[in-house]
Amino acid sequence: MITVSNLGMQFGGQWLFQHVDLQFLPGNCYGIIGANGAGKSTFLRILTGELDSTNGSVTVDPTKRVSVLKQNQNAYDTYTVMDTVIMGNQHLYDVMKEKDAIYEKPDFSDDDGLRAADLEAEFAELGGWEAESDASRLLQGLGIGTELHYDQMANVDPRLKVKVLLAQALFGNPDIVMLDEPTNNLDIEAISWLEDFLLDFPGMVIAVSHDRHFLNTVCTHTVDIDYGKIKMYVGNYDFWYESSQMVQAMLRNKNKKNQEKIEELQLFIQRFSANKSKAKQATARRKLLDKLTVEEMPCSTRRYPFVGFQPERELGKDVLTVKDVSVTVDGVKLLDKVYFSVNRTDKIAFVGENELAQTALFKILMGELEPDEGSVKWGVSTIRSYLPKDNSEYFDGNEMELVDWLRQYSAKKDDVYLRGFLGRMLFSNEDVFKPVNVLSGGEKVRCMLSKMMLSGANVVLLDQPTNHLDMESIQAVNKGLEAFPGVVLLASHDHEMLTSTCNRVIAFQPDGTIIDKYGTYDDYLAWMAERKAAQNA
């Protein structure tokens, strides 16, 4: 159990949160949510003991083993992948290494033999003989093949290092697991595996996340950081959202009724306070008026942008034909004779473990990369707009003010018009004069969305649009794509967005080919599960 008592955290004279009293119980999964800057990661770091709070205390059952998802990908570069995972249980790893060191000594003494015997017993009790096979299962579940298990971490692709550190956090049956954005940089298959793992996990899980599907799937409780407070709700993200909306609606309704009653009483008092026959009634109403209040609506840290794409013209019958496209990058064949056509009602989810293939295809479609073979033909009625995964070329070294940066992509040049689009993306007042090269990752994505909204496109291509965005911005993008009457080509890890937006799935296979299925993303997953079951039968 973890007990949080009168906890408060202050930065620069401002309280992030205070007067926090919570209990986290075994067997539950807690999802921590809140706007960017609300203090989610700070609160988690206080729970892990990495950060001291300004006041209050956190008490963790000392008999329980706590495992934390590490954030420094390069901290284990001198170790093998296997050792890095086993270090998730540091005591087991220390016993294993001490035991191995004794056996490697050239002058093995009687004392060494006695110590080795003790270590062997402890090693067995800690599950040491199953450690490598357990670690291997975790790695394979996350999509890391056995050929990499004994490689040095320094030689491992950064995208896979994230998975290794996640396997480390899950290794060895810890009692409590604390995860900060565990689905970041994971492909959808790995996220699905993680969800299944946590559903079966008997211990306590505390996770910061902005992945709605993940939170809805695994969480039994939701911990919301807002209004300078931290509140715990029983239920998943959707239950929290409905509950919080209901509470706000009730408060607004109560305030409205109280305000109407206040105005009615004030009018009566004003009219009859000087009337002797009504004096007692006026006095009674004045007492009632003193009891009525209109509660101030607290100011939320959540800010909701607006995403809306308005096409300049309707699409014609011919939208896009991709014919036998192949491309090899750095000696790896990413696309092999890929063929598909796009209809004007299509909203396509591009999925698969190989994100490089998705990005390569999008670059080919936008004319930024030449295929080795094949052709791409766009319909004459199409107007395309593109959100790349890597937007650095638009911002790095660019000292233009934000409003001037956007102006270069707009037919209308006046400030009021441009600031209207920036305002939809939460850039207001002095924000519009920021140099674009100092913007955060999330701000840069919101700039790109402003650019897309200006384009009048009837075909939008988005490569991992939710990277760097908070929950509120992700929901805004989701709603914008759902409402968009044109064609959507979407590569994303966001299960909720794919399911609610798309009516077709194109899945990239390891050999560079594709699977093309009409239906929702959930329909595709069900079809894949049936296919796998049939293959294993």
Locations of regions flagged by a protein language model:
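Short, flexible cytosolic linker that couples an ABC transmembrane/permease module to its adjacent nucleotide-binding
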Residues: 298-314
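ABC ATP-binding cassette signature C-motif
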Residues: 1-255, 309-537
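Short low-complexity stretches enriched in small and charged residues
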Residues: 25-26, 276-280, 301, 344
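ABC ATPase nucleotide-binding domains
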Residues: 251-265, 271, 276-287, 303, ...
